[in-house]
């Protein structure tokens, strides 16, 4: 599956969509732990990425503790998406402590598998909803737009801008 497939899956698959704008970090990892296939905005920020698309380009090396923990989880978690609470190092925990995470091994229609890891506690500054929505569409290669609960236009991916009738976000003021 391509990165754009996972961007769409992040908002279209109910198992991931529930986490898309959450203030808690969430990551969908490859089975071997080498890549984050999808992340919400808070999860991308945790790894220093501007958005999920940027994080999807990163490869985690063999010495990375996140990679090793995810690979171990993939072997231990039951197939079928049953959620299990795990205490993991990193994943938002303070240095030297463990974070309680909801973990599940997900299966997709194409036969692929991935590990969903969601931190159960927020650490540090809570990212405002408007910023989470903006980062959700930022960097997406597929047409996506984000709106606040009150209908306010927040942002759109580059691919969506021609469909919305403006060339850059400066033009959006006439739409709002």
Regions found by a protein language model. Give the residues of each.
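Long, solvent-exposed non-transmembrane regions
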Residues: 2, 10-11
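Short hydrophobic secondary-structure edge segments in sensory/regulatory modules of signaling proteins
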Residues: 26-28, 36, 143-146
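C-terminal helix caps at helix-to-loop junctions of PAS-family sensory domains
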Residues: 21-24, 32, 139-140
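Short loop/turn segments that connect beta-strands within the blades of beta-propeller domains
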Residues: 32, 149-150
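PAS-family sensory domains
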Residues: 15-19, 133-139
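Sensory/regulatory domains in signal-transduction proteins
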Residues: 3-6, 29-129, 159-176
